[in-house]
From Swiss-Prot:
InterPro entries, sorted: Anamorsin, Anamorsin_N_metazoan, CIAPIN1, SAM-dependent_MTases_sf
Biological source species: Aedes aegypti (Yellowfever mosquito)
Residues bound to [4Fe-4S] cluster: C215, C218, C226, C229
Keywords: 2Fe-2S, 4Fe-4S, Cytoplasm, Iron, Iron-sulfur, Metal-binding, Mitochondrion
Designated name of the protein: Anamorsin homolog
């Protein structure tokens, strides 16, 4: 009876036939000041219609291995209330495991196969708000401007550009290639230097590819020219005179 205190509401559950020992235990409970006792048979407790969290203590003379009974009694006691099982046939380890699975905490075993389980300090299905953010420190408004503050210096947009910045650039001033002294186009040249150098290269190739006379008599006329002479069919010309040959004349007949 050490589990029952003054002003407690107690549910006493008996199993089998009522004996003199049961009557004595109930009378001892009623002798405690302001203790209200409800006596119920184990086969009827689930049908009695008790409200959840109605009792402070439940004294159950029933097998503790009954999972359905243990879960039902857990609902009947108030948070932090206790359910005391007295089961002579119980196995200590099996009883402890069953009470844990039913939702009890702080399970203890006493002499005489008595097992005590406590209901957690909350109701089934209850919720609690978790404060994970903590106290957020106030951040100084560094970029906040006061429109009424005349001490703030503002930049004049007209002073951002000089007169030199307003002059329209020319193609030569925008050219990046060849500014280091050596005329060399960049990899992705877009200023026109690459095309200019390519044209110069082709011009020098044409100049170097001008045919030269091996016999030295080409200028005299066809009578003195070889069968493969590029000047064949052309009139005689002065020695050293520059003669422009067409593409067809530069190709071999065979």
């Amino acid at each position: 009876m050490n589990f029952v205190q003054e002003n407690n509401h107690v549910l006493y559950i008996w199993n089998g036939a009522i004996s003199g020992e049961i009557e004595q235990e109930v009378n001892r409970l009623k002798a405690i000041p302001n203790v209200q006792v409800n006596v119920e048979n184990a086969d009827r407790v689930l049908l009695a219609g008790y409200t959840p969290s109605q009792f402070d203590v439940v004294l159950a003379n029933v097998p503790s291995g009954n999972s359905e009974m243990a879960s039902s009694l857990l609902k009947l006691v108030k948070p932090k209330g206790k359910v005391v099982f007295k089961d002579d046939s119980a196995n200590a380890e099996a009883t402890r495991s069953n009470l844990l699975l039913s939702g009890f905490i702080n399970i203890t075993s006493l002499d005489g196969n008595v097992f005590v389980g406590e209901k957690p300090n909350y109701e089934i299905g209850s919720a609690a708000k978790l404060s994970l953010g903590g106290n957020k420190a106030k951040v100084a408004a560094v970029w906040k401007l006061d429109v009424d503050d005349d001490d703030d210096e503002r930049i004049d947009e007209d002073e951002l550009l000089d007169e030199e910045d307003k002059v329209k650039p020319t193609a030569e001033s925008l050219r990046v290639c060849g500014t280091t002294g050596k005329r060399k186009a960049c990899k992705d040249c877009s200023c026109g230097l690459a095309e200019e150098l390519e044209a110069e290269t082709k011009g020098s190739a044409v100049a170097n590819s001008e045919p030269k006379s091996s016999c030295g008599s080409c200028y005299l006329g066809d009578a003195f020219r070889c069968a493969t002479c590029p000047y064949l069919g052309m009139p005689a010309f002065k020695p050293g005179e520059k003669i422009q040959l067409t593409d067809t004349q530069m190709r071999a007949d065979i």
